Swiss-Prot record:
The gene is rplL. Forms part of the ribosomal stalk which helps the ribosome interact with GTP-bound translation factors. Is thus essential for accurate translation. GO terms for molecular function: mRNA binding; structural constituent of ribosome. One of its GO terms (cellular component) is cytosolic large ribosomal subunit. The lineage of its organism: Bacteria, Bacillati, Actinomycetota, Actinomycetes, Bifidobacteriales. Keywords: Ribonucleoprotein, Ribosomal protein. This is Large ribosomal subunit protein bL12. Pfam families: Ribosomal_L12, Ribosomal_L12_N. Residues 104-126 are annotated as: Disordered. Residues 104-116 have a biased composition (Basic and acidic residues). GO terms for biological process: translation. Homodimer. Part of the ribosomal stalk of the 50S ribosomal subunit. Forms a multimeric L10(L12)X complex, where L10 forms an elongated spine to which 2 to 4 L12 dimers bind in a sequential fashion. Binds GTP-bound translation factors. Gene3D superfamilies: 3.30.1390.10, Single helix bin. It comes from Bifidobacterium animalis subsp. lactis (strain AD011). Belongs to the bacterial ribosomal protein bL12 family.
Length: 126
């Protein structure tokens, strides 16, 4: 079995789309029975006492909530936003609700939301 260096793995992951990476993480979690999310207790311990002032978010996740009647236009919009292939974009749209973009800048997230809504989809920014 071939062994890959950390640099080779990072290079391979760098070429993947966010949707492909998300699918990989899910498969990794299932195969090795682990969870990629940080433990909740560690987050709670970081904020003792009074709640900190709420910061303005600078990264957003664009979530495709519902497709609507214009499925083909939504698939085209997803392809334009994510650079996914036709099959991957269709799978993402068919699996709604699903994230289309993750950790996107506010400007990019709002632009993607507008494109998807124009195509007939229902979209949330988280």
């Amino acid at each position: 079995m071939a062994k890959f260096t950390q640099d080779e793995l990072l290079e391979a992951f760098g070429e993947m789309t966010l949707v492909e990476l998300s699918d990989f993480v899910k498969a990794f979690e299932e195969k090795f029975d682990v969870e990629a999310a940080a433990p909740v207790a560690a987050v709670a311990a970081a904020a003792p006492g009074a709640a900190p002032a709420e910061e303005e978010k600078d990264e957003f996740t664009v979530v495709l909530s519902a497709v609507g009647d214009k499925k083909i236009q939504v698939i085209k919009a997803v392809r334009a936003i994510t650079n996914l292939g036709l099959a991957e974009a269709k799978a993402l749209v068919d699996g709604a609700p699903k994230p289309v973009l993750e950790n996107a800048k506010k400007e990019d997230a709002e632009k993607a939301k507008a494109q998807l809504e124009e195509a007939g989809a229902t979209v949330e920014l988280k």
